[in-house]
């Protein structure tokens, strides 16, 4: 296996909170997949949940070297946890097509958050 890309992102949680206060659920609808949306609606810390997902998706877009453009959207990157609680990444739509085109066979996600920040790193391998 070879590393195809590495991306890291850090999000200020208060900034996400401010956007939600101004625009309601619009940011969450734009960023979250349908599965994540269902979790977010009843999550005990929805702002923190959204900030962490946003960080992973930005890191993933950086790892793919594309950013969010040319048909890619945040909600095409879905963060979920495996049976041990480890964060994983599932792709949909154009993100999945891009991964197939690049020959991605594995994606690694690490995620951390503290009082003020959430950060994520994504590594993609061929």
Curated annotation (Swiss-Prot):
SUPFAM superfamilies linked to this entry: 4'-phosphopantetheinyl transferase
Record bears the keyword Lipid biosynthesis: yes
Annotated binding of Mg(2+), by residue: 9, 58
Cellular component aspect of the GO annotation: cytoplasm
Disulfide bond positions: none
Pfam family, one: ACPS
Top class in the EC scheme: transferase
GO function term, MF aspect, one: magnesium ion binding
InterPro entries: 4-PPantetheinyl_Trfase_dom, 4-PPantetheinyl_Trfase_dom_sf, ACPS, Ppantetheine-prot_Trfase_dom
Cofactor(s) needed by this chain: Mg(2+)
Domain of life, source organism: Bacteria
Localization (cell): Cytoplasm
Keyword annotations from UniProtKB, A to Z: Cytoplasm, Fatty acid biosynthesis, Fatty acid metabolism, Lipid biosynthesis, Lipid metabolism, Magnesium, Metal-binding, Transferase
Documented EC number(s): 2.7.8.7
GO BP term (any one): fatty acid biosynthetic process
Catalyzed reactions per annotation: apo-[ACP] + CoA = holo-[ACP] + adenosine 3',5'-bisphosphate + H(+)
HAMAP family named in the record: AcpS
NCBIfam families: acpS, pantethn_trn
Family: Belongs to the P-Pant transferase superfamily. AcpS family.
Summary of the function given for this chain in its UniProt record: Transfers the 4'-phosphopantetheine moiety from coenzyme A to a Ser of acyl-carrier-protein.
Name the record gives this protein: Holo-[acyl-carrier-protein] synthase
Organism: Escherichia fergusonii (strain ATCC 35469 / DSM 13698 / CCUG 18766 / IAM 14443 / JCM 21226 / LMG 7866 / NBRC 102419 / NCTC 12128 / CDC 0568-73)
